[in-house]
Amino acid sequence: MTKGTLQGSKRKKIRISGFRARMKTPSGRSILNERRRKGRKKIMAS
């Protein structure tokens, strides 16, 4: 059997789509604000 194609990594996920990564850029901050405005329970993936 071959390996599956998706080998997930928690560290990579957090570095790319975590809170600190979102706060670094203006567009990331706007994403967080939109999710807050929408009333999301979780504002980021992690």
Swiss-Prot record:
One of its GO terms (molecular function) is structural constituent of ribosome. It is found in: Plastid, Chloroplast. GO terms for biological process: translation. It comes from the Eukaryota. The keyword Ribonucleoprotein applies. Gene3D superfamilies: 1.10.287.3980. Residues 24-46 are annotated as: Disordered. Keywords: Chloroplast, Plastid, Ribonucleoprotein, Ribosomal protein. Its main location: plastid. Belongs to the bacterial ribosomal protein bL34 family. This is Large ribosomal subunit protein bL34c. It comes from Porphyra purpurea (Red seaweed).
